[in-house]
A protein has these predicted regions:
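Conserved catalytic core of two-component sensor histidine kinases
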Residues: 8, 15, 85
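Residue-level signal for the nucleotide or nucleotide-sugar donor/cofactor binding architecture
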Residues: 9-12, 79
Length: 139
């Protein structure tokens, strides 16, 4: 099976945005990855990278550097519904904005939808026990 060890995000401020995710989710920066245009933080099973705008040119993506709108979102799974609620409050204190307050989804998760300080979408989830019906998606 192919692995996906890194998920990277382009950011205007690698220091500020990586610190947001470190502070909220208690991740740790891997100092061996640090450069003037990159920060890498460890999650439980992968790394989360933050690329400065200069990385667009480095990757031959200069024409793509003026992105608008939401192009992806991150998911963070936690151990309890209380943890979802706690992390929502902490995220907002650190500069996030709530898009959708914690709620039960049709697929039987308890989740909240937020944007980080740069407007990137993320969800905080607790998968709940039990079955769900795909026919309930619009309820």
């Amino acid at each position: 099976m192919t692995t996906m060890p890194y998920v990277n995000i382009f950011t205007k401020d690698i220091k500020k945005l990586s610190k947001f995710y470190i502070d909220v989710f208690d991740f740790e920066e891997d100092m061996s990855l640090r450069s003037p245009i990159f920060r890498g933080i460890r999650t439980s099973k992968s790394f989360f990278g933050f690329n400065a705008p200069e990385a667009y040119e480095l990757l031959n993506l200069s024409d793509e550097s003026d992105t608008k709108g939401i192009k992806f979102f991150l998911n963070f799974d936690v151990r309890s519904m209380k943890e979802v609620d706690r992390l929502v409050v902490l995220s907002v204190k650190r500069g996030a904005k709530i898009v959708k307050n914690p709620y039960r989804t049709y697929y039987n998760w308890y989740q909240a939808v937020l944007t980080d300080p740069e407007g990137n979408l993320f969800r905080i989830n607790k998968r709940l026990p039990g079955k769900w019906k795909s026919s309930d998606w619009n309820k």
